[in-house]
């Protein structure tokens, strides 16, 4: 049930009947305060201005045409021309009834599902995942889960860094150390190898030359180099898969679409861009000059797509990647969860993609950028020694802290149940702390805040869910035994009911904008409204059995909505805490 969409359609019809153009924007929004109703139509003033009419006069004309019979109890004009809409309790009750009967809490699947490619996580081969991968992985996965829940076909694309000069270095150094069987190495060994290989590459010109030759051999399909490369990729992705499972992230080995996938396309891309007059030779390199981007001198910026030595760049790969996602994967929309520092690079690649006609304008390419994870000192989150924090170590600490926290509250809980609860709380806390912040801003990583049982945190939300379940346990009834109709009488019942019915709208915003913090805010607000309802509207001691059943249905739908909402975020729920 999408009330906002229903009201937008009705208000639109009224505005057009009052003289507004057919493409007018009703701007129906959820009201910020109960005194302004459940929804407000804010588009009147802009339309009235275009028509040269006083806004209130136009609002009155529109209101005369607005038929919300069976939907709104009343409508009113506020301020300079806002239309406030108060939903009818009978309308709320009818739709709550339908939502309770639905295993999707009343959320309908989209009528026109799209094929959506979501590019996220993208760790590098031969390196262990670190905290810098957290935001892309967690936010991207929440986006994927939301889109799939709404009925879209989602293609996960893990654009791993599995190509480039680093492989020449690694293969050369492994050979030097006679460590040809890379398959037996743990990833931590590979990280040590990487550091040593880089040191040799920087300090030993002969070694660097050999490393570069191995890159050429690898690109040329040399079997020995390819075999070593495959081992490096395999070790890395096996380790990453363990991390994904710990994080409750849906990525699998089948979702790996690394940089190497696009290698065969690169010569053709360069040749085609030359043939189309987009790419030219400049100082031995192949360059695309873009009027849309200026250098310091105010001249069109040159984007290199092939170096003097014949090597390709990340831009070339990203051009091929976008082309592949449209032509081969048949994407209707492509979302990239990549940090904000890559914005100009992506914009340049996509400008070339559009000019070359590889992806039509009708297929959005969206950079869902995000800020950095900071320590309490406001600087990038690092170890005390200033090093990068491994993701596995961060998750270990989350589990340790959560284990101590839940053991303190549940001293008699069996060990296996305690471990399961600690995992749900610890991993959930790390994820929710990230997801509950706007992705476009930096955020402070703070263990005490994220593991608190108060405020907009995972432990609070998980506890809120168990609290609703406990009402049912105390009631001693099954869902199938709730046969009395839903009735909405008290204001707190109405507020909770209206918020429950806004679940689909909230999912729609997250799907459109890639903003899981909107879902976190919704669920936190919902939990707060349930608390107010629970305190002021007796459930188990309601005046009549019919009222008791009605309120139990509201509690049931709250539990369903909290669970489904947290699931779209990848946050586990538990039965008791």
Curated annotation (Swiss-Prot):
The keyword Cytoplasm applies. It comes from Cronobacter sakazakii (strain ATCC BAA-894) (Enterobacter sakazakii). Monomer. GO terms for molecular function: arginine-tRNA ligase activity; ATP binding. GO terms for cellular component: cytoplasm. Its main location: cytoplasm. Belongs to the class-I aminoacyl-tRNA synthetase family. SMART domains: Arg_tRNA_synt_N, DALR_1. GO terms for biological process: arginyl-tRNA aminoacylation. It comes from the Bacteria. The keyword Cytoplasm applies. It catalyses: tRNA(Arg) + L-arginine + ATP = L-arginyl-tRNA(Arg) + AMP + diphosphate. It holds the Pfam family Arg_tRNA_synt_N. It is found in: Cytoplasm. HAMAP family: Arg_tRNA_synth. This is Arginine--tRNA ligase. Its EC number is 6.1.1.19. Keywords: Aminoacyl-tRNA synthetase, ATP-binding, Cytoplasm, Ligase, Nucleotide-binding, Protein biosynthesis. A motif ('HIGH' region) lies at residues 123-133. Transmembrane segments: none annotated.
């Amino acid at each position: 049930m999408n009330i906002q969409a229903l009201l937008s359609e009705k208000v639109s019809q009224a505005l057009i009947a009052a003289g507004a153009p057919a493409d007018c924007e009703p701007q129906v929004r959820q009201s910020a305060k109960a005194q302004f109703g459940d929804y407000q139509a804010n588009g009147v003033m802009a339309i009235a201005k275009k028509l040269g009419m006083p806004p209130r006069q136009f609002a009155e004309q529109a209101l005369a045409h607005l038929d919300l019979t069976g939907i709104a109890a009343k409508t009113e004009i506020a301020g300079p021309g806002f239309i406030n809409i108060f939903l009818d309790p009978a309308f709320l009750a009818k739709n709550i009834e339908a939502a309770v009967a639905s295993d999707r809490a009343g959320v309908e699947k989209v009528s026109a599902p799209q094929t959506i490619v979501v590019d996220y996580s993208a760790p590098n081969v031969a390196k262990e995942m670190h905290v810098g991968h957290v935001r892309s992985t967690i936010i991207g996965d929440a986006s994927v889960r939301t889109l799939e829940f709404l009925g879209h076909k989602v293609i996960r694309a893990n654009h791993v860094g599995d190509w480039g000069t680093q492989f020449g270095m690694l293969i050369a150094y492994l050979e030097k150390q006679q460590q040809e069987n890379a398959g037996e190495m743990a990833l931590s060994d590979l990280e040590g190898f990487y550091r040593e290989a880089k040191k040799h590459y920087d300090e030993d010109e002969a070694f660097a030359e050999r490393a570069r030759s191995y890159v050429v051999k690898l690109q040329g399909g040399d079997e020995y180099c390819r075999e070593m490369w495959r081992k490096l990729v395999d070790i890395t992705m096996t380790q990453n898969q363990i991390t994904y499972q710990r994080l409750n992230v849906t990525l699998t080995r089948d979702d790996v679409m690394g940089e190497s996938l696009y290698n065969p396309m690169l010569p053709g891309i360069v040749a085609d861009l030359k043939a189309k007059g987009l790419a030219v030779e400049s100082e031995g390199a192949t360059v695309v000059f873009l009027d849309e981007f200026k250098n310091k001198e105010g001249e069109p910026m040159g984007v290199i797509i092939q170096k003097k030595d014949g090597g390709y760049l990340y831009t070339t790969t990203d051009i091929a990647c976008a082309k592949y996602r449209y032509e081969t994967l048949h994407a209707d929309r492509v979302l990239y969860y990549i940090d904000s520092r890559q914005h100009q690079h992506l914009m340049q690649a996509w400008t070339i993609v559009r000019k070359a006609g590889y992806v039509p304008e009708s297929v959005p390419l969206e950079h869902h950028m995000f800020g950095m994870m900071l320590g309490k000192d406001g600087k990038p989150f690092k170890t005390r020694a200033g090093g990068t924090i491994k993701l596995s170590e961060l998750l270990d600490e989350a589990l340790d802290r959560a284990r101590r926290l839940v053991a303190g509250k549940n001293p008699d809980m069996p060990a296996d149940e305690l471990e399961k609860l600690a995992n749900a709380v610890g991993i959930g806390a790390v994820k929710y702390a990230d997801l509950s912040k706007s992705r476009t801003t930096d955020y402070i990583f703070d263990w005490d805040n994220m593991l608190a049982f108060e405020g907009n945190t995972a432990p609070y939300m998980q506890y809120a869910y168990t609290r609703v379940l406990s009402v049912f346990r105390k009631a001693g009834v099954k869902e199938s035994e709730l046969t009395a109709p839903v009735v909405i009488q008290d204001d707190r019942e109405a507020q909770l009911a209206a918020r429950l019915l806004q679940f689909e709208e909230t999912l729609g915003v997250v799907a459109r904008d890639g903003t899981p913090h909107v879902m976190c805010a919704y669920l936190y607000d919902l939990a707060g409204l349930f608390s107010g309802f629970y305190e002021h509207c007796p459930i188990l001691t309601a005046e009549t059995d019919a009222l008791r059943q009605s309120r139990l249905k509201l509690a049931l739908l709250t539990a369903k909505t909290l669970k489904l909402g947290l699931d779209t975020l990848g946050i586990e729920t538990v039965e008791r805490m």
